[in-house]
Regions:
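Extended alpha-helical targeting/anchoring segments
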Residues: 1-502
């Protein structure tokens, strides 16, 4: 098994104080992302998996499993803390001095690595979520709603082992970073990273702990919302009052359901990837809770110096036949309300990209196209711009957080109204899930179609855009419809619950 780089090349970089990656490749055409997770990490605490399926049917090239973080950063309100002993002591968090966004920016800088050309950016970095409420660190907003789930506002982990499955080549690359600030000699640092790689490669040779039969459907508890039916419709009417008064053009209220869920968390992810394949699929096990999702939408991406925001607004269900599907597409593209709502969010996307892009570089590369997913089709546009001098991955992410599709326009006033209309703090929902790559790039999706599991309770949240002529009953039903993919996954999770969930 060949390790890259050679020790001689590694030693030269180490002498210059450079962080480096040690990696090795293995043929893996029999492995799936799920089998990788089960063999390497058993879906235990402080592990994650990221996958992608575009158009509901085309699997993305790379899937990633991360584990054994050497540090975990998290934020609560106006304070942040870090655990640099995360491999050995899950409780060893120490408070950090300074503004949380400053401590995060410093950690991103500390975690920079010049990536080898043959590794994708996702092979190393900081992985996790920045919740909706992180915007309170940037904008002055009321912060008075109760927080019954009680999660950190943001958590990012830095895995010491990452496995990248290349679905095109049928191979897996196991990557371990070596950090120059560790104080180790070049020989010791190389040996430590190499041992982590080889341990993971040995784990790949074992059979995943799973049965092939599909088990049985298991009952889940009744879902209870933090709104009554009439209460949600009243919130929609109140939102329309603000629109008529000229405060806003659009706002996106949401409701959250809670239900008992006593099956293994990874069974829910396995069920979700089967029932609702999506461009951004993720499972994060943070120990005391899990974040599991199948999001359709980029929040912000920074790649090759280009910032991308991809607004999605306007929805129809998929047709039962190709003819019905085309008819529904034509109906969607003829719906003036849907088109007006999408245009507002396209303009908002232009503004968000423009906050961190060079003058004159912001442009839409796609406008009002239809993208099809497993259950629905959407109107989609794509906005890009070259990142300006002095801006970085974090400032680009904050320019788009939260997305207009989960807040409204104008964004700050819409968020104030959301705080008034909704009974509880949003938490993860409406924020971003993804990673800051070690090479300085970044890719986050919006935390939509996203569930939180904590204390055997499953939380699902969904919202809808309200405009001046919205029908309150239709808006209520839209939130119910958007929650269906996760409800269905929860109902079917028993099919995966016998074994093979860590």
């Amino acid at each position: 098994m060949k390790l890259s780089p050679s020790f001689e090349d590694f030693e030269r970089g180490w002498a210059q104080g450079r962080n480096q990656l040690v990696h090795a490749r293995l043929a893996a055409d029999l492995d799936t992302p799920v089998s990788l997770m089960l063999k390497l990490a058993e879906a235990r605490s402080d592990t994650f998996i990221l996958e992608s399926v575009t158009g509901g049917e085309v699997r993305g090239r790379y899937s990633v499993v991360g584990m054994k973080p050497d540090l975990i950063w998290r934020c609560h309100g106006t304070g942040s803390e870090i655990n640099r002993e995360a491999r050995f002591d899950a409780q060893a968090f120490k408070p950090l001095d300074g503004h949380p966004l400053d401590t995060l920016r410093a950690l991103i800088a500390e975690s920079r690595i010049d990536m080898p050309a043959d590794l994708p950016p996702i092979a190393a970095g900081l992985f996790g979520y920045l919740g909706y409420d992180m915007i309170r660190l940037v904008e002055t907003l009321p912060d008075v709603n109760p927080d019954p789930i009680g999660l950190p506002d943001a958590v990012l982990m830095r895995p010491s082992v990452v496995a990248v499955l290349d679905g095109v080549k049928g191979e897996v690359t196991v990557v371990a970073p070596a950090w120059a600030a560790s104080g180790l000699s070049a020989r010791a640092a190389y040996a430590q990273a190499a041992e982590r790689v080889m341990d993971a490669l040995r784990d790949l040779d074992r059979a995943p702990p799973a049965l092939r039969d599909l088990g049985e459907i298991a009952p889940v508890g009744e879902a209870k919302s933090n709104f009554s039916h009439d209460g949600y419709k009243a919130a929609v009417e109140k939102a329309k009052d603000y629109i008529r008064a000229g405060d806003i053009f659009q706002v996106v209220p949401s409701q959250r359901w809670a239900q008992r869920f006593e099956l293994p968390p990874f069974a829910l992810y396995r069920s979700l990837r089967r029932t609702n394949p999506s461009p951004f699929m993720f499972f994060f096990n943070f120990g005391g809770y899990q974040v599991i999702g199948a999001s359709p939408e980029i929040l912000v991406r920074l790649r090759d110096g280009e910032v991308t925001i991809r607004p999605i607004a306007g929805t129809r269900k998929r047709g039962a036949t190709p003819e019905e599907d085309r008819a529904l597409e034509a109906d969607l593209l003829a719906d003036k309300k849907e088109l007006a709502e999408h245009l507002m969010l396209l303009d908002l996307g232009r503004n968000d990209v423009g906050r961190v892009a060079k003058l004159g570089t912001v442009r839409p590369t796609e406008k009002f196209i239809i993208e099809r997913y497993s259950h629905v089709m959407h109107i989609v546009s794509n906005v890009v711009g070259e990142i300006a001098e002095g801006e970085d991955a974090l400032s680009a992410l904050l320019a788009g957080l939260p997305a207009g599709t989960v807040s409204g326009a104008p964004k700050v006033r819409a968020m104030e109204i959301i705080d008034e209309l909704e009974p509880e703090k949003r938490g993860v929902y409406g924020g971003g899930v993804g990673y800051f790559a070690a090479n300085g790039e970044m890719d986050f999706c919006i935390a939509l179609r996203t569930a939180v599991l904590k204390d055997e309770t499953l939380y699902i949240q969904a919202g809808g855009g309200v405009v001046y002529d919205s029908d309150p009953e239709a808006e209520y039903q839209e939130t119910v419809n958007k929650s269906r993919a996760l409800r269905r996954a929860a109902e079917d999770a028993g099919l995966f619950a016998r074994r093979g969930n860590g």
